[in-house]
Amino acid sequence: MALNLRKNHPLLKTINDSLIDLPTPSNISIWWNFGSLLGICLMVQIITGLLLATHYTADTSLAFSSVAHMCRNVQFGWLIRNLHANGASLFFICIYLHIGRGFYYGSYLNKETWNIGVILLLTLMATAFVGYVLPWGQMSFWGATVITNLFSAIPYIGQTLVEWAWGGFSVDNPTLTRFFALHFLLPFVITGLTLVHLTFLHETGSNNPLGIPSDCDKIPFHPYYSIKDILGFALMLITLATLALFSPNLLGDPENFTPANPLATPPHIKPEWYFLFAYAILRSIPNKLGGVLALAASVLILFLIPLLHTSKQRSMTFRPLSQILFWILVTNLLILTWVGSQPVEHPFIIIGQLASFSYFMIILVLFPIAGVLENKLLNP
């Protein structure tokens, strides 16, 4: 009994089945590393966030000063803050690569796992948004004002909804305190959803680059992939440390070093880089409600991807037309990200509109057509 505690103990057995004796396809590549990297990101963010929360004051008159005090007077406070701010960027880099992997290799056909994953993405976006408001700089304040204001586009109940979310008639102290409460709560919701995500994944087992069943050729997760994952951890943590120590403000907005002032609007309000693609889609539609719907659709479209799969093959490994479309889509998203960071003037408006149209066109129309064409090419 003592020798096999790992396999018999009710709690250790679950951990063993998920991380040690888990049967894993023998041919999964480094692209399958991002799930565990996201787990590390979540742990880093919760630990650094908890340490920051012990010194932070969620009050409009003190929030900005409390963050400044943390960086100046708290032991290694500057490092904890920089790790937390840049950890969010790495979190989004990993999740976008993880989703891209799922899209390329057809992992979305594990529908339950995929749908929980999309809900995880939405929760992460909500967490990052409310977190960005907490330092109470100019971009925090105006970002919160602009994005929460979008809910007023909802017919009939919009304005009431926005004032209810604000806790008043503008973004003010009640907004900041509730955003802090939400920012503290949501990472634990993400942790819970992650466990559900893993539970669904382990029902079917991992997909692999060929997109074919791999039951006949499975290897234990430990030591093979536990060792392989450590390489990913090292690379990611080195990247995070480099970013936090050498250029901590590279991905931030200089406007946020100015305390929030409701009487002075920044010349160019924009979110953090990881929301720019959605922001560009929002801005490319002149109508407020239309823009909000397009913004929501840009992320919610992920729920439709399993339904739009027309190919007889699961993975894109042997589907050249879909591969070309996939990389066009990636480029398109990079263009949207760039356009979102630019001012609203001549060339950028039309580029944003074309890129937004192509984004929906590629996913909703061209991918299903390419799948049907590739089926025809298989059986001419």
UniProtKB/Swiss-Prot annotation:
Entry binding sites for heme b b566: H98, H197
Transmembrane segments: 34-54, 78-99, 114-134, 179-199, 227-247, 289-309, 321-341, 348-368
KW Cell membrane (keyword) present: no
Matching Gene3D superfamilies: Cytochrome Bc1 Complex, Chain C
GO molecular function, one term: metal ion binding
Function: Component of the ubiquinol-cytochrome c reductase complex (complex III or cytochrome b-c1 complex) that is part of the mitochondrial respiratory chain. The b-c1 complex mediates electron transfer from ubiquinol to cytochrome c. Contributes to the generation of a proton gradient across the mitochondrial membrane that is then used for ATP synthesis.
Binding residues annotated for heme b b562, in chain numbering: H84, H183
Cofactor entry: heme b
Gene: MT-CYB
UniProt family annotation: Belongs to the cytochrome b family.
Designated name of the protein: Cytochrome b
Alphabetic keyword roster: Electron transport, Heme, Iron, Membrane, Metal-binding, Mitochondrion, Mitochondrion inner membrane, Respiratory chain, Transmembrane, Transmembrane helix, Transport, Ubiquinone
Any one biological process term the GO annotation gives: mitochondrial electron transport, ubiquinol to cytochrome c
Membrane topology: Multi-pass membrane protein
Binding site for a ubiquinone: H202
Locations listed in the record: Mitochondrion inner membrane
Record-level GO cellular component terms: mitochondrial inner membrane; respiratory chain complex III
Source organism superkingdom: Eukaryota
Summary of subunit composition and partner proteins: The cytochrome bc1 complex contains 11 subunits: 3 respiratory subunits (MT-CYB, CYC1 and UQCRFS1), 2 core proteins (UQCRC1 and UQCRC2) and 6 low-molecular weight proteins (UQCRH/QCR6, UQCRB/QCR7, UQCRQ/QCR8, UQCR10/QCR9, UQCR11/QCR10 and a cleavage product of UQCRFS1). This cytochrome bc1 complex then forms a dimer.
Misc. remarks from the entry: Heme 1 (or BL or b562) is low-potential and absorbs at about 562 nm, and heme 2 (or BH or b566) is high-potential and absorbs at about 566 nm.
Cofactor note: Binds 2 heme b groups non-covalently.
